[in-house]
């Protein structure tokens, strides 16, 4: 195992090439000053890809390129009605000419939830609604255990899988490269946005 990993170590693993890296860094000098910090920098992963931004695209970049997904044109996955994961999957389905069975459960309505739901509904998708995640899992346990449901291969919730996680590992290595290149000082602390945890 290499002493110091770089993104090059992951280049032997198939990817779709959707991530435009490195994502830019935004220096927030005024906010850093207000908080008495030496620096404050935001990594703009919302600009990960023209397809759709965010870490889900990083995960799908590896997951959907893996051998078990080659030729799969019908997918199923789960998320709340405003799920960023289902947005990324709907965009991926359109890009790869696939179809997504989106199994959704309730969450409180916000503008972002409405926008995400509209995006998923406008894609190559069939939406199946459940009142809550418990009833969904009881009625369709394969949505969380994996396999095939209704002829569709199940994408793990949040695209969280060993191969999908490589997208996040690559993001961390990308940030390390940016620090090494002097694009930002070595951070004392890293804060990561946490939605559903998927």
Stretches found by the model and what they are:
Residues 1-198:
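PLP-dependent amino-acid enzyme catalytic core
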